[in-house]
Amino acid sequence: MTEALYFLDCYMKEFEATVEKVTDDKFVVLDRTVFYPESGGQPSDTGKLVRESDGAEFNVLYVRKFNGDISHEIDGENVSNGLKAGDKVKGFIDWDRRYRHMRMHTATHVIANVIEKEAGAQITGNQLGLDQSRVDFSLEVFDRDKFAEYEKIANDLIAQKSPVNLYLVSRKEAEEKLSRLTTLAKGFSDEIKEVRIVEIEGVTIEACGGTHVKNTEEIKGVKIIKLQNKGKSNRRMYFTLVD
């Protein structure tokens, strides 16, 4: 199983690794990686792998989880001289892309928490993007006028410069001690023995595997740009970052 270096250090930009296997000349599994695989509504990292023996470069186009491994899809430009099991490589992520997603992801936790607490909404999904992100939620009474207030509350929380802590707890601890996580933890597969926690101090505690900033001040601010009624009690909110 690939060691996910991003799990507890989201600020790593480069790393060294060994190729464990290559499938179809383009799907590369490493023993360790900083590349985030698409999951939880967060798009994958992109970047490049550089073979140490000859400096050959391989662009990483997409990253995903597959059968317990983290698979890096590389372009086909160097297929004739492609990566092979045992090759030593250095990996470099597109930091601007990663950092934007980190800010977006932490912002999503903040603004979703505000909607839950202030409106009584139930969050049903999310999708991060570079320019805008969305939060899906269930809410019976959809008072659009109140979302300007929710935006202000979210920005006030962001301005508090709250530390964002990442840590692992046992599945048992998550189920017993963190009431917010009980349902989520019980929904995990039996193989999961530890739960990764994202705690925004004074704001929210979540079970989350994504990448996040260290402090809410890095988000700078959020702006709600669109609200949609998706039928019955299903709602959707789009927001962007204020730079």
Swiss-Prot record:
Q: What is its main location?
A: cytoplasm
**Biological process (GO) annotations?**
alanyl-tRNA aminoacylation
Taxonomically, the superkingdom here is: Archaea
Give the co-factor note. Answer: Binds 1 zinc ion per subunit.
Cofactor(s) demanded: Zn(2+)
Please report a single Pfam family linked to this protein.
Answer: tRNA-synt_2c
Any one GO CC term of this protein is: cytoplasm
Q: Which UniProt keywords apply?
A: Cytoplasm, Metal-binding, Zinc
Q: Where is it localised?
A: Cytoplasm
Q: Where does Zn(2+) bind?
A: H105, H109, C208, H212
Q: Which family does it belong to?
A: Belongs to the class-II aminoacyl-tRNA synthetase family. Editing domain AlaX-M subfamily.
For this protein, the record's PANTHER family field holds: ALANYL-TRNA EDITING PROTEIN (PTHR43462), ALANYL-TRNA EDITING PROTEIN AARSD1 (PTHR43462:SF1)
Name of the featured protein = Alanyl-tRNA editing protein AlaX-M
The scientific name of the source species is Methanosarcina barkeri (strain Fusaro / DSM 804)
